[in-house]
Amino acid sequence: MYYGFDIGGTKIALGVFDSTRRLQWEKRVPTPHASYGAFLDAVCELVAEADQRFGVKGSVGIGIPGMPETEDGTLYAANVPAASGKPLRADLSARLDRDVRLDNDANCFALSEAWDDEFTQYPLVMGLILGTGVGGGLVLNGKPITGQSYITGEFGHMRLPVDALTLMGFDFPLRRCGCGQMGCIENYLSGRGFAWLYQHYYHQSLQAPEIIALWEQGDEQAHAHVERYLDLLAVCLGNILTIVDPDLLVIGGGLSNFTAITTQLAERLPRHLLPVARAPRIERARHGDAGGMRGAAFLHLTD
């Protein structure tokens, strides 16, 4: 059995998957903040409960926001302060007497989608998250591609390409990102960026769901905004896809629920790619809230 943990600032979610990658059981508990010991206990107790329930010693994978293992072997996860700065992988491996694998939550999202029954035919899968921020991950032959700093797939911190300024105007503001850089695409393509663009052009403060509702009602201003956003997304993806050249692009995050993104993006991409390049198949993420657990569990699938 494959145990997958999706750990965040508020909850620890465990999903148990069988050899056919089907969810057999899940349980959630609040994320302990009092101490590292309490955090370790919460994870180990869930593993013990799963072992007893299924009568096997399952493999353990964990998806967590941040950098799963820094140079000195410790976790960096600002949203999980009880475990941040601690050697989480080594400590859990010792306590559970098995190989515990960690990766960041965006990589786990991409891995979950790459192992979808319909998507396993694609060797190189790119996951793109358009949510509160912009991120993602890459999966090659069923395994996540993880660089030395765990920043593979941090697409949101690529800067606006020159073609974006041609589209938006050379007086378009380069916003300062939380990472300290100017013009990161996350500030324009995330859910918050979607709303900011609307406010910038129309001087109205609306959230993304409100703008999308207007678009669905046929509002001309919302329609023009969505067209501009999709053009900007295509420009930025043109650079990324030229580097990555994936077989499949899976889009997740809150904005993936807006069908225009997956249905209208493909027709815009070719003009931003090399003439010989083929645009990837584009699909909306299939596994929703279970994706984090699935991807974490599947860190052990290619053994």
UniProtKB/Swiss-Prot annotation:
UniProt keywords, alphabetically: ATP-binding, Carbohydrate metabolism, Kinase, Metal-binding, Nucleotide-binding, Transferase, Zinc
Key word Flavoprotein present: no
UniProt EC number: 2.7.1.59
Catalytic activity: N-acetyl-D-glucosamine + ATP = N-acetyl-D-glucosamine 6-phosphate + ADP + H(+)
Pathway linked to the protein: Cell wall biogenesis; peptidoglycan recycling
Alphabetical GO biological process terms: N-acetylglucosamine metabolic process; peptidoglycan turnover
Gene Ontology MF terms: ATP binding; N-acetylglucosamine kinase activity; zinc ion binding
Sequence positions that bind ATP: 4-11, 133-140
Positions bound to Zn(2+): H157, C177, C179, C184
InterPro entries in the cross-refs: ATPase_NBD (IPR043129), N-acetyl-D-glucosamine_kinase (IPR023505), ROK (IPR000600), ROK_cs (IPR049874)
Top-tier EC class: transferase
Pfam families per UniProt: ROK
PANTHER family in the record: N-ACETYL-D-GLUCOSAMINE KINASE, ROK (REPRESSOR, ORF, KINASE) FAMILY
Family statement drawn from the similarity comment of this UniProt entry: Belongs to the ROK (NagC/XylR) family. NagK subfamily.
Protein name from the UniProt record: N-acetyl-D-glucosamine kinase
